[in-house]
Amino acid sequence: MSKKYDYLVVGAGLYGAVFVHEAKEAGKSVLVIDKRPNIAGNVFTEDVEGIHVHKYGAHIFHTNNKKVWNYITRFAEFNRFTNSPVANYHGELYSLPFNMYTFNKMWGVVTPEEAAAKIEEQKKEAGIAEPKNLEEQAISLVGRDIFEKLIKGYTEKQWGRDCKDLPAFIIKRLPVRLTFDNNYFNALYQGIPVGGYTKMVANMLDGVEVRLGEDYLEKKAEYDALAEKVIYTGPIDAYFDYQMGYLEYRSVRFETELLDKSNFQGNAAVNYTDRETPWTRIIEHKWFEFGKDDEGNDLPKTVISREYSSEWKPGDEPYYPVNDEKNGALYSKYRELAQKEKKVVFGGRLGEYKYYDMDAVIASALDMCEKELG
């Protein structure tokens, strides 16, 4: 008996949406399901008073990959937003990334030579030849002042551990700019889709049946019977019923509120780098689109989200894979099981247990499409 669909795609996020579009173009029949009540996965944006709110954390598209940029701009026009976060340390405001504005505020230096000399002086003072932990690694790269004010508290909140107890490899490099360039990402292409990410993903899924609020793993046999092959973008350990144990994640909790004012902090992202403030950062969503609605009108209200890093436990929303040896070894075991599933392709952030920027997810999905669809 032939199956009703060529492909079942589990998950309507970016990875799934790329495959859906390519499969449809190749003349394949596709059914998409997602256990959430909405499409777009973690890039989902919802309209609140004309503001596109990034419900699962800020997503700023940036890439140097021309193929990916040309691909994604078929589904949305992108604005010219560039990410220039601000760091708030006990009310002192600093520019991120670390640049001449940062160094001037920190030490009163004016020229690049003075800034470079100050950083070198602090690195020499520390005298760390072989960093044994994250604290020593950061100080060996940028000196103690920047570490204490802009790295230490933020990192400890993010990881829930002291910097002395975190491995040095977490910070491989800290970009230091001896210019006044405030653009956080050194990417050729950057922006936010006009109208929000949800609209963009809807364009990718156009013309394909999508069923929301459907948990694949609860009805696996029923759904597997519908399609020749499955593209699975959920957690790989959940697919195998956690038989080897749980892969660990870091999670994030958001407190989002609508405020009856037009401007809360004057920037899309403000990082709180002291240890005492419980949140890691505040996102003010309207500034991703310059404070305007889709028609270009000024928005009278604003929406902010306070972000808190939290320890993940089974059942929580998985955000960031914990890429340590223990979890890497466990993922390898699940990967071996996955390779035996000849009718299932595992992909995306959760399916591959990998921290992916959006452009890398799209590139990975396009590579898979070439192999799968020819």
Indicate where each model-derived feature is located.
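Mid-domain catalytic core of redox enzymes
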Residues: 26, 216-337
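Dinucleotide-binding Rossmann-like beta1-alpha1 core, especially the glycine-rich loop
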Residues: 49-124
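C-terminal catalytic lobe of FAD-dependent flavoproteins
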Residues: 317-374
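Glycine-rich FAD pyrophosphate-binding loop
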Residues: 21-49
